[in-house]
């Protein structure tokens, strides 16, 4: 059985075709600049040169049509016909409170996703467009929605409620939702597999450290708390997002600096975080180079990052009443040993002993244990695979 995984952005589309018998990606690709000049598809197949197509694509339907043509192309494709695609799994950023698991697409589901647009105005609209385009082109193929927010729907009220007037929750649905759920679920299950245990036996802190950052307490295989909140702006410092700050700073910037609400939103989302503190950028390779040149602001940004992760690990160990394992994943989590060492140094008292040589290893494979054998709490680096998780969730429903 082959599952096509689709992740639609506002002007881009990522895809993978996964053979579920082996769980291998037969092809993966990216379509960029949809609806604007210079539209381009880049497809990768193991053992072959990249397949690149440049042609005008007026919308996501054009893009998906090109994806399907590329997958069945006689010279560059990996399947003979679209009939080989058993189902399509769609990443949907926000499912609100209605969805605690993945669902088959129907009219009611589409209506509910549309109602969540106000909660994810940048992400849900292109997700919806992608689903509709696939339905148009593949009317007899089952479609499944896999929600970023679903994994966190197991949080209790005390974890997800904000201490605001209660009607803001009942009328406006303002609460903590959490994001990166598919990634957190994947690595929480993967670490259990690597430890030869069931996820239900473990208390795990999963650290998804990319340009966006979220940390989750996974107790018995279920999310009980997470750092991102009503939006992906909350939590620890991120690439260009501030994370948690005193909310009064917002009103201060509006009143004292004369910024509009939109300008402040732009500052907090695009000009803050590691970029804002370091003045260097969001790419950790650039931060690493700046640290090598003794750039004090780059060092400070990395210190803040490590400190905030450490605080969160400690807080979640307390919330769960114990800790068995920590997982680092995503771009920075997988490739920045200097962040991991900052996050873990000082946590020896809760049973963490880091193996420095393993921490500096680049050979991660499907998952690398970077704590010492004697470490009570096991620490792993595990490459995330959201596409495979989406495909598994899709397969379970069709």
Curated annotation (Swiss-Prot):
GO terms for molecular function: acetate kinase activity; ATP binding; magnesium ion binding. Its EC number is 2.7.2.1. It catalyses: acetate + ATP = acetyl phosphate + ADP. Keywords: ATP-binding, Cytoplasm, Kinase, Magnesium, Metal-binding, Nucleotide-binding, Transferase. Mg(2+) binds at residues 7, 386. Mg(2+). Can also accept Mn(2+). Its cofactor is Mg(2+); Mn(2+). The record marks 180, 241 as: Transition state stabilizer. ATP binds at residues 14, 208-212, 283-285, 331-335. It is found in: Cytoplasm. InterPro entries: Ac/propionate_kinase, Aliphatic_acid_kin_short-chain, Aliphatic_acid_kinase_CS, ATPase_NBD. It comes from the Bacteria. GO terms for cellular component: cytoplasm. Pathway: Metabolic intermediate biosynthesis; acetyl-CoA biosynthesis; acetyl-CoA from acetate: step 1/2. Pfam families: Acetate_kinase. Transmembrane segments: none annotated. One of its GO terms (biological process) is acetyl-CoA biosynthetic process. Substrate binds at residue 91. The active site is at residue 148. Catalyzes the formation of acetyl phosphate from acetate and ATP. Can also catalyze the reverse reaction. Belongs to the acetokinase family. Homodimer. PANTHER family: ACETATE KINASE (PTHR21060), ACETATE KINASE-RELATED (PTHR21060:SF15). This is Acetate kinase. The lineage of its organism: Bacteria, Bacillati, Bacillota, Clostridia, Eubacteriales. The gene is ackA.
């Amino acid at each position: 059985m082959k599952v096509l995984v689709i992740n639609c952005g506002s002007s881009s589309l990522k895809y993978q075709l996964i053979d579920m018998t082996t769980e291998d990606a037969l092809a993966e690709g990216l379509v960029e600049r949809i609806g604007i000049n210079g539209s381009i598809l880049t497809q990768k197949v193991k053992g072959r040169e990249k397949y690149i197509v440049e042609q005008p694509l007026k919308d996501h339907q054009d893009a998906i049509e090109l994806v399907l043509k590329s997958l069945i192309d006689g010279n560059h494709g990996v399947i003979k016909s679209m009939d080989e695609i058993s189902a399509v799994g769609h990443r949907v950023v926000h499912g609100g409170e209605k969805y605690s698991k993945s669902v088959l697409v129907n009219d009611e589901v589409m209506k509910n996703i549309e109602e969540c647009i106000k909660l994810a105005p940048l992400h849900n609209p292109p997700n919806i467009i992608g689903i509709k385009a696939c339905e148009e082109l593949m009317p007899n193929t089952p479609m499944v929605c896999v929600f970023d927010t679903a994994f966190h729907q197991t949080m209790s009220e005390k974890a997800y409620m904000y201490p605001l007037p209660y009607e803001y929750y009942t009328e406006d649905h303002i609460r903590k939702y959490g994001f990166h759920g598919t990634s957190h679920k994947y690595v929480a299950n993967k670490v259990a597999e690597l430890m030869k245990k069931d996820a239900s036996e473990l208390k795990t802190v999963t650290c998804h450290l990319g340009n966006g950052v979220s940390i989750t307490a996974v107790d018995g295989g279920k999310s009980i708390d997470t750092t991102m909140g009503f939006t992906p702006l909350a939590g620890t410092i991120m690439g260009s997002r501030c994370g948690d700050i005193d909310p009064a700073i917002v009103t201060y910037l509006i009143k004292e600096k004369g910024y509009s609400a939109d300008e402040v939103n732009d500052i907090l989302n695009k000009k803050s975080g590691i970029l804002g503190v370091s003045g260097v950028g969001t790419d950790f390779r650039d931060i690493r180079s700046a640290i090598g040149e003794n750039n004090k602001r780059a060092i400070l940004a990395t210190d803040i990052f490590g400190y905030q992760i450490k605080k969160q690990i400690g807080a979640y160990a307390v919330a769960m009443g114990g800790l068995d394992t920590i997982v680092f994943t995503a771009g920075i989590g997988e490739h920045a040993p200097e962040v991991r060492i900052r996050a873990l140094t000082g946590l020896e008292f809760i049973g963490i002993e880091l193996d420095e040589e393993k921490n500096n290893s680049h050979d991660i494979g499907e998952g690398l244990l970077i704590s010492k054998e004697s470490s009570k709490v096991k620490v792993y680096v595990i490459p995330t695979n959201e596409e495979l998780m989406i495909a598994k969730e899709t397969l379970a429903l069709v």
